[in-house]
């Protein structure tokens, strides 16, 4: 049993963490203070009257109203993450056998959520494959038309705002316009955008937005947000016949503990940091420009419109063939320099993000990688 005692994290706090799924989830000091107050089990339920979204101490009810305004949506509910939000929407508004039309870069959880809800999936393909993997957004019309011509019902349109593979930002307005023309509900998966960059739900004509607290809103896992328009409120918030105060799709209550507290405590920090998105893009583009000088090749759309970067790295792969550490040399060399978050043993392609780092740290990372390549050649 000793292995469960005194747990520590091997990626220490002193390391610069480049993992794209973690850069947006780093807690500010305000949230760390809240952890101490609320780390016990059902601590948010001290003054609960039956439903999480109506709790006023801590101010969960106010927070959900504020987050809805922040996203320019009508309503919001806490979830355990974006994946749970997607399933809630699919289960609440679609009928078994309906089709979900989604982009080819959609996260695996979009497919799994549809499968769990007993729905079918139709993909919208690429305008271009390698190296940009840009989605053909106008292709949504064609896919929907083809399905309808075959007598199939499309219950939901889903667009991945930014995908987790290439970091491509999709023009949600285009798909929102198509959704309105077709009269089909539109879900925007903002796991990589809400909390990192500005998102305006009504501007892009989204009926639903799902967000990830732990991925992009400086919160502890698992937590997220489902924001939705008033038009679909009755379906999303339908209550149980036997337990009338409990919302069915939320199974009564969702993120009922420390994660939602960190989400709230980080909210003022998040509101301010999205205003600095242009500066984050400058850092990202600087990294791309500098590392392409030494043989890296950025995959995905150029110039970068999001902080998640995927590189082809043939120069690292060539070094790995000669180095006795093989593919682990790059991870080892980064670790020596206080840098983590890059997958160990992988040298053909890497993903990274410098979101939220100071310029001095960004320059340090770039110079460290250049030094590694030069010294290990």
From Swiss-Prot:
Its EC number is 2.5.1.73. The keyword Transmembrane does not apply. Converts O-phospho-L-seryl-tRNA(Cys) (Sep-tRNA(Cys)) to L-cysteinyl-tRNA(Cys) (Cys-tRNA(Cys)). Pyridoxal 5'-phosphate binds at residues 82-83, 189, 212-214. It comes from Methanocaldococcus jannaschii (strain ATCC 43067 / DSM 2661 / JAL-1 / JCM 10045 / NBRC 100440) (Methanococcus jannaschii). InterPro entries: PyrdxlP-dep_Trfase, PyrdxlP-dep_Trfase_major, PyrdxlP-dep_Trfase_small, Sep_Cys-tRNA_synth_arc, SepSecS/SepCysS. Keywords: Protein biosynthesis, Pyridoxal phosphate, Transferase. It catalyses: O-phospho-L-seryl-tRNA(Cys) + hydrogen sulfide + H(+) = L-cysteinyl-tRNA(Cys) + phosphate. Belongs to the SepCysS family. The lineage of its organism: Archaea, Methanobacteriati, Methanobacteriota, Methanomada group, Methanococci. One of its GO terms (biological process) is translation. It is an enzyme of class 2 (transferase). The keyword Zinc-finger does not apply. Homodimer. Interacts with SepRS. Gene3D superfamilies: Aspartate Aminotransferase, domain 1 (3.90.1150.10), Type I PLP-dependent aspartate aminotransferase-like (Major domain) (3.40.640.10). GO terms for molecular function: Sep-tRNA:Cys-tRNA synthase activity. This is O-phospho-L-seryl-tRNA:Cys-tRNA synthase.
